[in-house]
Design a protein with these regions (language model features):
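Cytosolic juxtamembrane amphipathic/interface segments immediately preceding
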Residues: 1-6, 53
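Interfacial segments of alpha-helical transmembrane regions
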Residues: 6-21, 87-105
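Hydrophobic cores of alpha-helical transmembrane segments in multi-pass integral membrane proteins
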Residues: 15-26, 67-76, 102-106, 143-148
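Interfacial helix-loop-helix junctions of multi-pass membrane proteins
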Residues: 31-41, 111-132
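Perimembrane loop-to-helix junctions flanking transmembrane segments
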Residues: 38-54
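Membrane-interface loop-to-helix entry segments
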Residues: 53-74, 130-149
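Cytoplasmic juxtamembrane regions at transmembrane-helix boundaries
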Residues: 76-102, 158-166
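Terminal transmembrane helical module of multi-pass membrane proteins
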Residues: 143-166
Length: 166
């Protein structure tokens, strides 16, 4: 992660935390609730085929959402604290870049740990089981692309901010 002191007056860690939170919100709201492709423990012995299993999954989905709120609140706190001590230099590239790094990191961490190592759920469990890996790999590729794109934006934003202040 980029050090906040080297970001040309912008707290990169705040943007990364916002991105981690938004990545979790996207996963939880879109994939768990709207599309209902999976829930937190659907591949860990709690398929949504009974009211009791559904209740367990909804509770774990809620705990998951609490963690995404925590990331978002931490990002807000870091931004607030930084802005009380320093002048924040806003950039069209720094905040989106940092958020993309965080969102992509969420996908990579969640995709590797929950989908591959623990196997507690997979991205799209509505397709035949032999196709789950393709959705999981696509999720990881999407996350990697966001990290790379976000890193590029961060570097460009830092260069532009330094030039403006020089």
């Amino acid at each position: 992660m980029t050090d906040d002191r080297d970001a040309g007056g912008f707290p990169v860690s705040a943007g990364v935390l916002f991105g981690l939170g938004l990545g979790g919100f996207f996963d939880g709201i879109i994939l768990h609730q709207v599309l209902q492709w999976h829930h937190m423990l659907t591949s860990a012995g709690y398929p949504p085929d009974s009211v009791r299993n559904f209740q367990i999954n909804v509770m774990w989905d809620g705990l998951f959402h609490m963690s995404t709120y925590a990331f978002t609140a931490a990002g807000l706190y870091v931004l607030w604290r930084y802005s009380r001590r320093n002048h924040v230099r806003w950039s069209r590239k720094l905040l989106p870049g940092a958020m993309l790094v965080g969102f992509g990191a969420f996908n990579l961490i969640e995709g590797i740990i929950d989908h591959q190592i623990l196997g507690i759920h997979h991205v799209n469990e509505t397709v035949p089981r032999e196709q789950w890996i393709y959705w999981d790999l696509g999720f990881l590729a999407w996350g990697a692309a966001m990290v790379v794109g976000g890193w590029y934006l961060l570097k460009r934003g830092q260069q532009e901010t330094r030039l403006r202040t020089a």
